[in-house]
Amino acid sequence: MALERTFSIIKPDAVAKNVIGAIYNRFESAGLRIVASKMIHMSKEQAEGFYAEHKERPFFGALVDFMTSGPVMVQVLEGENAVLANREIMGATNPADAASGTLRSDYAASIDENAVHGSDAPESAAREIAYFFSEEEICPRTR
């Protein structure tokens, strides 16, 4: 088992539903520790930069509009195999396909407004964490 970090976003739809605490409880109940967290309202430039890999996809404009439509919570999660653990907690990208009891099954309305984002690999996690957090903002949990 490898101790690793992953990046997570609670998207505008879930923030609007006031389920931040419930989502944090799921992370912690699964053994993940929140080592950095902040609420931000992404600018168009931030959202375009973060999702730059999707720039040529037909959904890019709608994704940027959605991610800038309200505040989001960005956080760094740490734990054993954190990337995979968080992806299991989130469930399938499309909430219609998400297993019962996952975040997307419980809190997402559609594939477009699917409540949460999580890194898909340790390499993307490192890049995404650095996009929103300086090393000084991350507080390792040693106790």
From Swiss-Prot:
Reaction(s) catalysed (UniProt annotation): a 2'-deoxyribonucleoside 5'-diphosphate + ATP = a 2'-deoxyribonucleoside 5'-triphosphate + ADP; a ribonucleoside 5'-diphosphate + ATP = a ribonucleoside 5'-triphosphate + ADP
Tell me the organism. Answer: Alteromonas mediterranea (strain DSM 17117 / CIP 110805 / LMG 28347 / Deep ecotype)
Query: Which GO biological process entries does UniProt record here?
Result: CTP biosynthetic process; GTP biosynthetic process; UTP biosynthetic process
**Predominant cellular place of this UniProt entry's protein:** cytoplasm
EC numbers on record: 2.7.4.6
Q: Return the NCBIfam families for the record.
A: PRK00668.1
InterPro entries linked to this entry: NDK-like_dom, NDK-like_dom_sf, Nucleoside_diP_kinase, Nucleoside_diP_kinase_AS
Q: Which CDD domains match?
A: NDPk_I
Q: Catalytic residues per the record? A: 117 (pros-phosphohistidine intermediate)
Q: Where in the cell is it found?
A: Cytoplasm
Q: Of which family is this protein a member?
A: Belongs to the NDK family.
The protein's required cofactor(s) are namely: Mg(2+)
UniProt binding sites for ATP = 11, 59, 87, 93, 104, 114
> What protein am I looking at?
Nucleoside diphosphate kinase
